[in-house]
């Protein structure tokens, strides 16, 4: 009996073990809380970030757009839910056009960014191709053989089909660029026909190039709420350009057709595609031919949606008057790295409002602005000052000569501006008020924000742009140097004087 009482039952042993574990857990909790109560070291935020990473399905990275003083974006890029804030695109279809010589350079970035959030889209090219699970349709597959047979514009089309390896190996995109351009114009009308056949009855059709970026949140808000347009009407929207007096929506900037207009064009006029295929050899551009067909058959002209539908990219946008509080719907000439950067900016922006041109400047361009850059072209060309010597005048490009300020209208600083980049830099500074206490109205009316100097030509600009690098000159003479500079004081004063954009400056797309 005594022995029996000395031997504990299995249940009692389990209770004792559980008690010991509970006690140890309590001690561990107290130690943990005590450490948390202590002042957090500088590395605490990083340690906390590391501890929560496992809770995200995707990865969290340092945001490469984040810099000291740039409070537009979050310091971390959480890629676990890239489509969480993507708008509802029901009734809207994207149709993107590319070329076989560029598809594998341009399309993958689109597919990894904005296109990854679209439930459906169509891709067209001048050759049928496959990128992973995504199919690219040949817009010219049904083009009449008789129209192609004796047309040199189709030499590239035939060469691409005969290439037994990758297009990169057979076709030099740089040297064959003009051939790709000549071939491209034939895709527009056949693409309309195939789009309607494959994806009929959408409210809106957005057509874009492989170097076009679309701000989808802005675009859907504008089409469905802000514009006031009814897709049951025949509508053609874009950034208007002119050739020979004919207005058309610039293809690279992107353009929009209402479903009603596309249906009418294709279903009511079955011969339009064939007719314009023949016309193509005598016209320069496919976007022009589309506009001609819409006017001829539907009596519809393009409605101007610029600068919202825009032909520039962040580094070439002319920030300033007319390009500030306006929302952006598209941008053009975007390479893959730029597309990725703008997507990243949209993903990591701290604010959830309509994205305006000002936001692009403050988030992507302002952190890179500095007083001057050598071997750089910031695209200043609004007002020019050129060496008055006849030989120098002949040497200068006609575009710059046409924008010279008259000698009798120049002040003393401007008369010396062509002599050196240092002199050129003084032109914008000469507009500053002596007491630096000018009114906001005066600051808002500033007309000189930056300069560019090269070969005794000094030009200033009424807006501010970042621009792009120029090769260092082989000529050792100082006048061959490219120099660009920004009057940061004037730029920042203008921005302060403008104040906050209280409301997005939506533009009414009018004829």
Q: Where is each model-derived feature located?
A:
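A conserved hydrophobic helix/loop-capping motif in glycosyltransferases and polysaccharide synthases
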Residues: 93-101
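Short, acidic, metal-binding catalytic loop of nucleotide-sugar glycosyltransferases
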Residues: 89, 109-121
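Conserved catalytic core of nucleotide-sugar-dependent glycosyltransferases
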Residues: 204, 212-292, 296, 309, ...
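Active-site rim elements
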Residues: 178-179, 248, 273-282, 318, ...
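Short, well-formed alpha-helical segments that are part of the catalytic scaffolds
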Residues: 76-79, 102-114
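C-terminal catalytic/acceptor-binding lobe
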Residues: 3, 8-66, 282-288, 293-511
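Active-site-proximal specificity loops/subdomain of glycosyltransferases
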Residues: 126-202
């Amino acid at each position: 009996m005594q022995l029996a009482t000395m031997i504990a039952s299995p249940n009692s042993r389990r209770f004792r073990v559980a008690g010991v574990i509970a006690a140890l857990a309590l001690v561990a909790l107290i130690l943990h809380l005590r450490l948390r109560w202590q002042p957090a070291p500088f590395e605490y935020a990083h340690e906390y970030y590391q501890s929560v990473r496992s809770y995200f399905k995707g990865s969290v990275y340092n945001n490469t757009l984040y810099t000291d003083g740039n409070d537009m974006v979050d310091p971390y890029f959480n890629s676990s839910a890239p489509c969480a804030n993507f708008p509802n695109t029901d009734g809207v279809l994207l149709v993107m056009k590319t070329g076989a010589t560029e598809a594998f350079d341009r399309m993958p970035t689109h597919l990894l960014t904005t296109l990854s959030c679209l439930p459906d889209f169509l891709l067209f090219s001048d050759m049928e191709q496959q990128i992973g699970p995504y199919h690219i349709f040949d817009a010219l597959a049904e083009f009449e053989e008789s129209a192609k047979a004796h047309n040199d514009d189709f030499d590239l089309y035939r060469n691409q089909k005969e290439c037994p390896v990758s297009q990169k190996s057979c076709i030099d995109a740089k040297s064959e660029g003009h051939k790709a351009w000549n071939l491209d114009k034939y895709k527009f009308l056949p693409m309309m026909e195939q789009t309607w056949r494959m994806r009929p009855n959408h409210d809106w059709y957005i057509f874009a190039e492989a170097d076009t970026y679309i701000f989808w949140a802005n675009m859907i808000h504008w089409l469905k709420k802000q514009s006031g347009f009814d897709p049951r009407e025949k509508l053609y929207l874009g950034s208007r350009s002119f050739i020979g007096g004919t207005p058309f929506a610039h293809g690279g900037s992107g353009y929009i057709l209402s479903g009603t207009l596309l249906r009418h064009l294709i279903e009511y006029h079955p011969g339009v595609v064939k007719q314009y295929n023949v016309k193509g050899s005598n016209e320069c551009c496919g976007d022009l031919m589309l506009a001609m067909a819409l006017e001829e058959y539907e009596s519809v002209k393009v409605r101007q949606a610029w600068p919202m539908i825009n032909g520039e990219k962040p580094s070439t946008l002319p920030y300033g008057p007319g390009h500030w509080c306006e929302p952006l719907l598209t941008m053009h000439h975007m390479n893959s790295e730029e597309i990725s950067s703008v997507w990243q900016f949209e993903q990591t922006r701290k604010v959830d409002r309509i994205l305006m041109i000002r936001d692009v400047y403050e988030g992507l361009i302002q952190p890179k602005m500095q007083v001057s850059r050598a071997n750089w072209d910031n695209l200043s060309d609004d007002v020019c000052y050129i060496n008055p010597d006849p030989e120098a005048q002949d040497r200068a490009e006609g575009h710059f000569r046409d924008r010279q300020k008259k000698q009798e209208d120049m002040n003393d600083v401007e008369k010396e501006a062509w002599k050196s980049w240092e002199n050129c830099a003084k032109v914008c500074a000469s507009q500053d008020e002596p007491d630096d206490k000018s009114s906001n109205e005066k600051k808002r009316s500033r007309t000189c924000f930056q300069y560019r100097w090269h070969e005794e030509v000094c030009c200033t600009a009424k807006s501010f742009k970042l621009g792009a690098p120029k090769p260092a000159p082989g000529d050792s003479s100082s006048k061959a140097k490219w120099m660009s500079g920004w009057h940061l004081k004037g730029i920042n004063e203008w921005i302060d004087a403008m104040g906050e954009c209280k409301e997005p400056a939506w533009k009414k797309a009018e004829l």
